[in-house]
């Protein structure tokens, strides 16, 4: 595995804590790793992790996008984590049942923030089989 970059000490500690917790559930696959990494980027998503994701059930909470603690940046973090978790493109349960996709999941909307370099890290965690070659090439230059 490649060396993971963290935005700050709190992000690193959050990731380690959640990873250790997931080991107890035997849930340390790429889906979980990417999700806990991404939700650890922003202080709001770290502090409200249990409102966003239920580790016991392995379920995201789409309605967390509408919580008052969300900021535009934490919404981007949440959307990318949701999309990489299960290809979610919805902003509510109602949208899901009506098959109404949200344009807020488009890369042009998600990546236009200071977290973009860390979003790439989350993608590398989720898709190591596709990003390993690029990582190896960059390291050999």
Model feature map: region roles:
Residues 1-79, 86-141:
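Extended, charge-biased low-complexity segments
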């Amino acid at each position: 595995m490649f060396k993971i970059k963290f935005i700050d000490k709190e992000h690193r500690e959050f990731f380690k804590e959640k990873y250790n917790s997931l080991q107890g559930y035997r849930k340390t696959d790429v889906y979980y790793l990417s999700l806990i990494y991404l939700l650890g980027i922003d202080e709001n998503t770290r502090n409200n992790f249990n409102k966003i994701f239920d580790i016991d059930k392995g379920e995201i909470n789409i309605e967390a996008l509408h919580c008052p603690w969300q900021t535009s940046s934490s919404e981007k973090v949440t959307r990318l984590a949701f999309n990489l978790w299960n290809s979610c493109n919805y902003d509510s349960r109602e949208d899901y049942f009506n098959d109404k996709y949200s344009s807020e999941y488009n890369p042009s909307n998600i990546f236009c923030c200071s977290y973009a370099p860390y979003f790439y890290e989350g993608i590398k965690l989720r898709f190591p089989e596709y990003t390993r070659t690029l990582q190896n090439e960059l390291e050999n230059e």
